[in-house]
Amino acid sequence: MSSSLFILDENLEPLVSKNIRALPNLSSVLSSFKQCYHDGSPPILSQNDWFFIHLKRDFLHFVSVIHTTDKPNIDLMTILAFLEQFYHLLQKYFEIEVLTKNVILDNILLVLELIDECIDFGIVQVTDPSIIKDYIRVKVNVPRVTVDNEEWSPGEESSSSSGSDSDSEYSNTNKRKDKKKKRKKKKGTKGKSVGKSKLKSIMVNNKENRGINVVETVKETLRNKNDTGKEAANDELPNDGNDLYINGDIAKTIIMPISWRTKGIHYAKNEFFLDVIERVQYLMDFEKGVIRKNLIHGEIVCRCYLSGMPKLKISINKILNRDPQFMSNSSFHQCVSLDSINTIEKDEEKNSDDDAGLQAATDAREIEFIPPDGEFVLCQYELKRHVKDAPMVRLKDFEIKPKLKKFKIQIVTKIQTNFKPTNSTSKLNVRIPLTKVFQEYKIDLSKQIRFKANIGKVVFNLSDDFLLWEIQTMKGHREHSTNKSSQYNSDEDDPNTCASMVAEFPLFNQEEYDRLQEEMKTSMNPPPLRTGPRLEELYRQVHDQQTSHVTPRDKLVNIDFEIPYCTCSGLKVEYLKVEEPQLQYQSFPWVRYKTVSDEEYAYIV
């Protein structure tokens, strides 16, 4: 059992501390953790009869303290998993991607309330955001700035910038649903079912963000339904404060077998969104031709807006084909029941000689689950690609061509896609490092730098020394070459099927510089007028205080892409069924696919 819980900043200074077991001196316990902690420490440390389970996320440290006498009665990995889930819970509440020190300090009371609900006397209870949000309804204190008569918060920016345009459709859908619910409440209609016989409610009163006053009121109302299904006017909740009341079935949910979904959920339009997102991790030594990493990190993200207690059935081709790598390296949400798959394996062994029985078992191989309300991750998996499998976007050629006689240097890059011609990228950016070029050659930034591209555009980052080639849309099996002046000797180099870009940097000419200086001394004419920014002065100011060594990152050509309607592993959802035997409503399931590059998708040059 956890004795205490800390949230520390990056300097290991306490932001929030919760003394669960009434320890006499928390400061001495924290000082023991500071003594044994260092960069690169394992997640579990021991010092002075104390065990410290710590987790670093963003700019914060989450630390749980356990005494040695309690260690035999608790699983340390369970506490580590709890810290991870608690971090995601804070993200859901604050609606931001990165937790900072200021956000925690501005919401200390809310964080303490969340700790009390998640853990009871050191024992983990529940960390599901959809359940806890119905218990603790507190307005989050986040900074807001008025821009063009509209309020803006950091969470709104992170949610809109991190996702694509398709992800913003979901947020817009939620906003439209909230507006519809508010209109219905104003008209006097019922927005959410609150049980059959009795209603237990908790009213949360938070005035001017000065404190949290929780007033518990218990109201019992009889709901008599007539043949038309309408309720009496006296049974309706007040329209102005419906958001302050919670469903009475929530308290029973956490002790029921289906603890991730409450009863009494109702939506006017029943929809279910399923996204298959695969992140490709690829690292290759371009000079040696050795592939160091070639992995696929996939996840199935769902957004559920269904009424009642629906039962979903999903069939995936990887399960139908009994892919051993997928089955051994995949993890599912707690709502998924894998009993049907295990039963099918037994039926296949029994009916191995019976073709009809084997076909029936194959048709019935599916995932069955009752989804939680809102957004959740249904499945996570990791697959290894074969060495001979071509990457989705391949660096075909990278060459630095110095032309010393002309005092110029050219950088040539070729990339090639390897997916279906019917698909195309919605985003494609190539990051070309220049640190090595600026160290080995003396670049003259006083002269004009030339870029030529018949597709996309090229941006020169002066402070970080790299070129960013923004291509955006590119169809499958189409090659882009950065050397337009080269001779095309094959079909692959046909200018009709190739796009080119060339970056040319001028080299410093000492003889020309001395000659111009002598002419300026003897000439009566003023120096020529120069317009535009002086890049050489800006570069000198930026790089004067920086070290001049080449880091491993400066040798990587990074490729950032996004391919909608495509999966690298070939995973496909065969069908998706929604069944609700009591309500029997019409549902609208949606399935999408997307392949994106991981943070490490690069070539070592």
From Swiss-Prot:
InterPro entries: Adaptor_comp_med_subunit (IPR050431), AP2_Mu_C_sf (IPR036168), Apm2_N (IPR027200), Clathrin_mu_CS (IPR018240), Longin-like_dom_sf (IPR011012), MHD (IPR028565). Keywords: Cytoplasmic vesicle, Endosome, Golgi apparatus, Membrane, Protein transport, Transport. It comes from the Eukaryota. CDD domains: AP-1_Mu1_Cterm, AP_Mu_N. Changing residue 273 to A: Leads to sensitivity to sertraline. Disruption phenotype: Leads to sensitivity to cationic amphiphilic drugs (CADs) such as sertraline. The keyword Protein transport applies. It is a peripheral membrane protein. GO terms for cellular component: AP-1 adaptor complex; clathrin-coated vesicle; cytosol; early endosome; early endosome membrane; Golgi membrane; nucleus; trans-Golgi network. Residues 174-196 have a biased composition (Basic residues). Belongs to the adaptor complexes medium subunit family. This is Adaptin medium chain homolog APM2. It comes from Saccharomyces cerevisiae (strain ATCC 204508 / S288c) (Baker's yeast). The lineage of its organism: Eukaryota, Fungi, Dikarya, Ascomycota, Saccharomycotina. The gene is APM2.
